[in-house]
Regions:
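Glycine-rich loop at the start of a catalytic domain that most often binds anionic cofactors/ligands
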Residues: 43-48, 76-85
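Alpha-helix capping/helix-boundary segments
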Residues: 102-103
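Gly/Gly-Pro- and Ser/Thr-rich, intrinsically disordered tail segments characteristic of DNA damage-repair
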Residues: 79, 118-125
Length: 529
């Protein structure tokens, strides 16, 4: 029996504020690092007191907190890890994310109350490894980012139901295998395996001829230069049905070093998408009431349906269903198949040739799917033998636009679709940003038809179109009227033009505290968020 009754949206946090923001915007769980032994040293990270407060805040709202404990320790760090773990176990957090087997066994001894989640750093790429970690006490594996959907499905079909599968769905990708990289350490002495990555893969490089030392020849692909090792970002928002249908139980958003706005916007987007999945798949009604138990749609060995085709009516009625990943299990034709297991090979039935189609690109999807995946379908009469066909989960336009409203590099769908893998993004390394945060809500009052008090971040002027990012809903779009700005002392001002100052302005709709206010930039930039 599966442990979860709903897919988990797992959000990042680099500090206590980020943790609370993630919970406020719908995260089922938040992962964050302490002051030591996590894979991100750039963010402020959380103290033991922060973990106590954060865990209490999350639990009161039905969410969980996971702590990254996934460095690859050296001998001189082992006892310090043991001591830190002894303190961490009493803070109320729910799980540890580990990558080292020794640390995993230490955690079982020192902190048996904490769940163990195996980090992507461990490089789990097959069901044998997943089962081995399960036997060692893990209750979740974070699969290597290099896995395609069929590999996820095959692992899900061959591991215990109470072993969670966590998969990355959004954010930065690494040019090294699941983040295990020596590049930064080699060039700068900053150890990426201890959270200190200098990201030299994002740098621009020049060529130096052996006999002309000191003469640098730039490598230029565009006016921006050339970035030889730079990878695209991941964006699976329009494809989460494929991932959940493949057996993932937790959807992980990358970004512990990102802003509170990024955390809010992306957590809200993926939570809304999961809610749509649950309703459109018939697991819940629109009010969140359970209609039937949630389970993945993977067909396991031993299942009566394993390897058997559905009827033609059932298949063709759902012709844009979840055909994701080049199958290890053969595709099978709709009709004319003898009883029992049939290996797709050189048999034919009627006018249908039974054999692997020449081009399994596995998608007939809405044109609103934004990434580098193909919009193709299996040849007529075929369906994937390893997954039950179902209609594609449709998402509203506003939701599909959300990933473009945070700072990002060129998007891809990672390695999930074999024919359309993540690529180098060699023409630029900086983030693209078409929207910027102009303020954060401090309070709202019904005074004078509604007024919002904000902490300013960027200029707001009369006639400007802004959006309030709302938890569990589409953003509230609003054109700022003239003549309504006041400063903190109540004096009327023509515009909000001083960052980090308190102002108020008209706002007819009630908006929650800490909601981000964003606006289109007048000129899209490549400035990092």
């Amino acid at each position: 029996m599966q442990r979860r009754n709903k897919p988990e949206v797992l959000a990042p946090a680099g500090n206590l504020r980020g943790l609370k923001t993630a919970v406020d915007y719908g995260a089922d769980a938040v992962y964050c690092g302490g002051k030591s032994f996590g894979m991100r040293s750039a963010p402020k990270n959380l103290s033991l007191e922060d973990f106590e407060e954060g865990a209490r805040y999350a639990h009161e709202r039905g969410a969980r907190v996971y702590v990254t404990f996934n460095v690859l320790p050296r001998n001189n760090e082992v006892e310090a890890m043991r001591e830190y773990l002894g303190k961490l176990k009493d803070t109320g957090v729910d799980a540890l994310i580990v990558s080292d087997i020794g640390v995993m066994l230490m955690a079982k001894q020192v902190a048996p109350n904490l769940e163990l989640h195996v980090s992507t750093q461990a490089g789990v790429t097959n069901y044998q490894a997943a089962n081995a970690f399960y036997e060692l006490g893990a209750r979740r594996v974070v699969l290597a980012r290099e896995m395609d959907l069929q590999a996820v499905r095959d692992i899900r079909a061959r591991i215990p139901d109470d072993l969670d599968i966590e998969c990355f769905v959004h954010g930065a990708m690494c040019m090294a295998f699941s983040g295990r990289c020596l590049f930064s350490n080699y060039l700068t002495g900053r150890d990426g395996n201890h959270g200190e990555c200098a990201q030299p893969c994002r740098w621009k490089y020049s060529i130096v001829e052996e006999k002309r030392p000191g003469q640098y020849f730039p490598i230029e692909q565009t006016a921006e230069g050339a970035y030889l090792f730079n990878s695209q970002d991941m964006n699976m928002l329009a494809h989460i049905d494929d991932l959940l249908d493949s057996g993932a139980t937790s959807l992980k958003i990358e970004g512990r070093s990102k802003s509170a706005y990024y955390i809010a916007a992306m957590t809200n987007a993926y939570k809304t998408a999961v809610n749509e999945y649950m309703v459109q798949r018939g697991f819940e009604d629109a009010d969140g009431n359970v209609l039937k138990p949630f389970r993945d749609r993977v067909i396991r060995p031993g299942d009566p349906e394993y390897g058997k085709p559905d009827t033609e009516d059932a298949i063709m009625a759902n012709a844009d269903g979840a055909f994701a990943g080049k199958p290890d299990i053969d595709a099978v034709p709709v009709g004319g198949v003898p009883s029992g297991n049939v290996s797709a090979g050189n048999v034919s039935s009627g006018n249908i040739a039974i054999g692997e189609p020449d081009n399994l690109s596995y998608h007939a999807r809405s044109t609103r799917r934004k990434s580098n995946t193909a919009a193709e379908i299996l040849p007529e009469g075929w369906h994937h033998a390893g997954v039950r066909p179902a209609p594609h989960v449709t998402l509203p336009d506003w939701l599909l636009d959300e990933p473009d409203k945070v700072a990002h590099r060129d998007y891809s769908t990672g390695f999930y679709y074999p024919e359309h893998k993540v690529r180098q993004s060699t023409d630029r390394s900086a983030y693209f940003r078409a929207w910027l945060v102009v303020g954060e809500v401090l309070s709202w009052s019904p005074e004078d038809g509604g007024r919002v008090t904000i902490m300013s971040r960027n200029k707001i002027e009369a006639g400007q179109e802004v959006e309030f990012v709302l938890p569990g809903a589409a953003p509230f779009a609003y054109t700022v009227p003239a003549g309504g700005f006041r400063d903190a002392d109540g004096h009327w001002v023509e515009a909000i033009n001083n960052p980090a100052h308190v102002f108020s302005m008209p706002c007819p709709q009630e908006v929650p505290v800490n909601a981000a206010i964003r606006s289109r930039t007048k000129k899209p930039t490549l400035k990092a968020e």
